[in-house]
Amino acid sequence: MSSSCSGLTRVLVAVATALVSSSSPCPQAWGPPGVQYGQPGRPVMLCCPGVSAGTPVSWFRDGDSRLLQGPDSGLGHRLVLAQVDSPDEGTYVCQTLDGVSGGMVTLKLGFPPARPEVSCQAVDYENFSCTWSPGQVSGLPTRYLTSYRKKTLPGAESQRESPSTGPWPCPQDPLEASRCVVHGAEFWSEYRINVTEVNPLGASTCLLDVRLQSILRPDPPQGLRVESVPGYPRRLHASWTYPASWRRQPHFLLKFRLQYRPAQHPAWSTVEPIGLEEVITDAVAGLPHAVRVSARDFLDAGTWSAWSPEAWGTPSTGPLQDEIPDWSQGHGQQLEAVVAQEDSPAPARPSLQPDPRPLDHRDPLEQVAVLASLGIFSCLGLAVGALALGLWLRLRRSGKDGPQKPGLLAPMIPVEKLPGIPNLQRTPENFS
């Protein structure tokens, strides 16, 4: 029975040796020296690091004197484990025939990489970044190779590998793991991102096609401030600035949306202001309000940004105090201050004093459209009037210069038939 078991063991070892030898020789160095890697449930080949290839050695587990594989196995300096599992992890020692230790090998088990999950985002119109995460936890040291290239139009095979289309390396961020950044991208172009995960047991690649206008997502607006408007217990004035990562250009602007709610109210009210400020006119008097803003490309490219941190403000509770200046004292100083303020080139700061005129929240574009429509209708009316006047003058001039044509403004009743008009018909009496 023991001989049959030993024979079966020899057969399994021979099969495992054939499988491992056909797949790969001794594994190349990866990570710390003296460490080799394997996958659970698969055969593993360990190589004695201190001897030349083909030298017969004996193998032991570290701290265990039992022989695992003798020098007469015919495997030389290699140790073949038919099917490894977690108990097989650890350190193995190899010795030559003279008893000298050849070296130590540490076996670690893990899994080959799966396809990584990749996503890309652009915070402005000329740079974008891509992040990734492993498809599965391999338990082994892992590296990532990242590159990108510009996609060509269908049929442009000659440009597929030209220097103008790449591929180029996607520089990985040294401060943030699993992230690479592409600078100087073209807003209307399409790019292919290549992220390859590599570990000692293999490699796996993910290819992702991206368009800058589709992945555009600005950073949240900055500097949000909420202030009360004196004398108006239901108004709040909110202002903010562009995110620092967005370069302001006339053809690449942002639009904004603003949300606000009173304290202890879960529902948000949303408005889309024009510009970098908004006056809330329906605030709840006496209650603090939370306000937040987000941004998006003004042509709706990409998606809305994340919300900015909330800012709080409470409407004014006191009545408006009209201060009457004392002109009997310091009249000259006040007049000089007013003149100096009018002559100053610095832009006037917005006043927080209430404006008695009603607020006009109409869109300036809407006002321009109305004015343009009125102008077009006025021009059309003038053109029609001028055409009618010219036609009337022409008909009048032609009637004076020659006889009227029958059928064209000619009288329907003969002149001699009209009452009170003498008969002008030629007779002998008329000539006598």
Swiss-Prot record:
**Reported tissue expression:** Widely expressed in all adult tissues and in embryos. Highest levels in kidney, skeletal muscle and embryo.
Q: Which residues lie on this side of the membrane: Cytoplasmic?
A: 394-432
Which UniProt keyword terms apply here?
Disulfide bond, Glycoprotein, Immunoglobulin domain, Membrane, Receptor, Repeat, Secreted, Signal, Transmembrane, Transmembrane helix
Q: Which residue numbers delimit the Fibronectin type-III domain? A: 112-219, 220-317
Q: Which residues cross the membrane?
A: 373-393
Q: Name one GO cellular component term.
A: membrane
- Family note: Belongs to the type I cytokine receptor family. Type 3 subfamily.
Q: What is this protein called?
A: Interleukin-11 receptor subunit alpha-1
Q: Which gene encodes it?
A: Il11ra1
